[in-house]
From Swiss-Prot:
Pfam families for this protein: Abhydrolase_1 (PF00561)
Upper lineage: Bacteria, Pseudomonadati, Pseudomonadota, Gammaproteobacteria, Moraxellales
Domain of life: Bacteria
UniProt keyword Hydrolase present: yes
Name assigned to this protein: Putative carbamate hydrolase RutD
InterPro entries in the cross-refs: AB_hydrolase, AB_hydrolase_1, AB_hydrolase_fold, Pyrimidine_utilisation_RutD
GO molecular function annotation: hydrolase activity, acting on carbon-nitrogen (but not peptide) bonds, in linear amides
EC numbers, comma separated: 3.5.1.-
Species per Swiss-Prot/TrEMBL record: Acinetobacter baylyi (strain ATCC 33305 / BD413 / ADP1)
Family affiliation: Belongs to the AB hydrolase superfamily. Hydrolase RutD family.
Reaction(s) catalysed (UniProt annotation): carbamate + 2 H(+) = NH4(+) + CO2
GO biological process terms held by the UniProt record: nitrogen utilization; uracil catabolic process
Keywords: Hydrolase
Gene: rutD
Functional summary from the UniProt entry: Involved in pyrimidine catabolism. May facilitate the hydrolysis of carbamate, a reaction that can also occur spontaneously.
Length: 266
C-alpha cells in the first residue's frame, strides 16, 4: 500500500490524515503538504485499486472496505488520535471510520468534509452516469479529458491547459482497471449519510467546506448536511469548483487550519 507520513519535529504534534476523492491518490493533496507539515504530522495515502497494477476490487465493494483500509494503516503506524480531512469520497471514508471503528485505539479529533453530501444529488448522478458512459464507450482518454470539466472552474481550466494535459497523460499511463473505477463509482453513488451516521457526526467537531460554483456537487448538499449538525461549521466559498483544494489552496488551507486550531486536543 502506498502512503507517505511526514513527521513533525515535535513528537507531541497532532496527526492529520488526508483522504482524496474518486481518483484515490494521495498526491491530490500536494497543495496542502507544505502548510500542514509546519504544524502537524501529516499522512497521505493511495486508496486501494487506484493504480494500473492494482488487483481487481471485490464484488460489492463499499465504504466498509475503504474505511477498513485506513483503520489497518493507522494501526500499522501506531496512530491513535488524529484529525481527518476528506474530499468528497474521502470525507465519507472519515464518516465510516468514525461510525464503524471509533474506539480507544481509533479516535477522530475532528472531521473536515469538502464538497460532501447527505445523499446523491440528481445533478451529481447525471455527472457520474456521463462519466461511466465515457469510460465504457469512449475509453480512458475521453474519461480523463472530461474530468477537468467536473473538477475546476472554466477560467482556471483556460489558464492551466498545459498543466492539465501533462496530468492527464500521467494519469492515463497509470490508469486502474476499468472494473475498479466502476466499483468505486458504484459505492460512491450508493452512499448515504443516514440517521445513525448523523448521530455519529454530532459527537465530533465537524467542518463542512463547499463551493458555490461546484459543477459536480451542488453546494446546497453541504448546506443540507450542515443543517442536521447543530454544532458543525460551514464554510461556503463563491469560487473554486469541486477541487478548490487545488484552485483556491491558500484560502482553503487557512480555513482548515483555523478549524483544526479550534478543535485541538486538550
Amino acid at each position: 500500500m502506498n502512503y507517505q507520513l511526514f513527521k513533525h519535529s515535535d513528537e507531541n504534534a497532532s496527526y492529520v490524515v488526508f483522504s482524496s476523492g474518486l481518483g484515490g491518490h494521495g498526491s491530490f493533496w500536494q497543495a496542502q503538504l507544505d502548510v500542514f507539515r509546519q504544524y502537524f504530522h501529516v499522512l497521505i495515502y493511495d486508496q486501494e485499486g487506484c493504480h494500473a497494477s492494482s488487483e481487481l476490487l471485490a464484488d460489492g465493494y463499499s465504504f466498509e472496505h475503504l474505511a477498513l483500509q485506513v483503520k489497518q494503516l493507522l494501526q500499522q503506524l501506531n496512530i491513535v488520535r488524529f484529525h481527518f480531512i476528506g474530499h468528497a469520497l474521502g470525507g465519507f471514508i472519515g464518516i465510516e471510520l468514525a461510525h464503524r471503528y471509533a474506539s480507544e485505539t481509533c479516535q477522530l479529533l475532528s472531521l473536515t468534509l469538502i464538497n460532501a453530501w447527505q445523499q446523491l444529488d440528481p445533478h451529481t448522478l447525471r455527472c457520474f452516469t456521463t462519466r461511466i458512459a465515457l469510460l465504457q464507450h469512449a475509453g480512458t482518454a475521453a474519461y480523463l479529458h472530461a474530468q477537468a470539466l467536473f473538477l475546476y472552474p472554466p477560467l482556471w481550466i483556460s489558464e492551466h491547459t498545459a498543466l492539465l494535459e501533462q496530468q492527464e497523460a500521467k494519469m492515463q499511463s497509470d490508469f486502474p482497471p476499468h472494473a475498479n473505477v466502476l466499483k468505486r463509482l458504484n459505492a460512491l453513488m450508493q452512499y448515504q449519510v443516514n440517521t445513525a451516521r448523523i448521530d455519529t457526526l454530532k459527537q465530533l467537531p465537524v467542518c463542512l467546506i463547499a463551493n458555490q460554483d461546484d459543477m459536480l456537487v451542488p453546494y446546497v448538499q453541504s448546506l443540507n448536511l450542515w443543517k442536521k449538525l447543530p454544532d458543525a461549521q460551514l464554510k461556503l466559498l463563491p469560487y473554486g469548483g469541486h477541487a478548490s483544494t487545488v484552485t483556491e489552496a491558500r484560502q482553503v488551507n487557512q480555513l482548515m487550519l483555523d478549524f483544526l486550531k479550534t478543535s485541538a486536543p486538550t
